[in-house]
């Protein structure tokens, strides 16, 4: 069977079929499997594993671990079941992004819900690959974006607003503009807990630029039924005294939630940063002296938005080292802990009650500049900075732990990217074209870390950067790599169980739903490659288009 594609027949909101809420595919929902589906029993869920991938991070704790029939003994039986094209309306192409798709899909009641980098939302029948509806916003965002589906409502965002759609039809129910100025944007999947939707702005607007003065991250708590604000929390209060130049903060991914409804968020970097060039007269972040709270931090907030604690990994960040990944709530040594990592290429484990650091572990390649911010946080524009005039910085802007972690309850898994950039007192010295070429040549690693000790259990070197995060089911860990491969590893040993090509390059994570694995390939690296959302299924025998590769 050849991989087939199904397309919506019109732009804007198009209802192709009435959406039945009955499960029609093969999953672990308790319904009888449909004809032709393999019938392996669902393995008992590891600690923290969800019954299905119904939330952006798998569950409220963002463990990216789910129960499924997929194991190390049958993962090689995954084959192509269906494909749906990622079709740009021209906005991403005009921005040089070419069919951008970077999100983790969610699967609710047998329907796959997802979003592309033009903020367009799509519903796809899991069992057949049939597109049920689309709602096109044609609103460019920086990604990873995505949706959250709860109680028959799809929560999403455009580059400026949080929105709610009917899960059955795609009809918009409400919209709430959140950005404070046109230097800001939104590029995350909303969080949801107990009737409240959580969305943060970021200091990036693809139509205007990034880290422009006055742009900041603000976390909004919105009434899920109406979109009305309940509270907001400023992630970078006062922009450190110079809002005309400074910027910073923002969330890439949804908050995590504990049983009491407390929120845990990972906050992005301050600006200006070296990657975009220092503003005249203010080298090395001297327009923003001090540690620049609460950037590059894990922050715990109460359900009412009160700050409970924070841990800052990179004070006075110079190099775009966001701590942007959703904090993972799990246990270690019998105690609740928070594990996180980001573009600094450092994993941390914190006491969930107090925020105390339990362990800290650099992963991937580091070039010796992890603490440069401490050398410069009290500098003035005329200070002599004890750094080389030129040096190679690693992790660079697209290095470190760029995408989300996963845990099986005892081991944390991190997809690590090794990519250096040349740096100087004026900023990055590499041209855009050279930098883009270097992304394709970069390598990476999948790293497994013992949560009790903070020690590496295994570390698999990869020929291409795994921007596809980590996802776990039973004893299998999945990721995708930039050059367009889907990988599966043995969770205990790191042995590669599966390596199979996608239809194009990718920076999108996978979703595990029953005996399906859904992966997006939205980065064509040649004119022959096709941007597709691909569903792999145990026992399926379809093929990717002949032009892929």
Model-predicted segments: where are they?
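Conserved blade-register residue in beta-propeller folds
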Residues: 123, 164, 221, 298-300, ...
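Bacterial signal peptide processing site
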Residues: 27-29
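Bacterial N-terminal signal peptides that target proteins for export
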Residues: 1-13
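C-terminal motif of bacterial Sec signal peptides marking the signal peptidase cleavage site
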Residues: 22-25
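Aromatic (tryptophan-biased) beta-strands that constitute blades/sheets of beta-rich domains
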Residues: 33-96, 130-137, 171-180, 228-236, ...
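Repeat-blade elements of multi-bladed beta-propeller folds
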Residues: 50-58, 96-120, 139-162, 185-211, ...
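Acidic, glycine-rich loop-and-beta core segments that form the ion-binding/anion-interacting portion
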Residues: 293, 302-303, 320-379
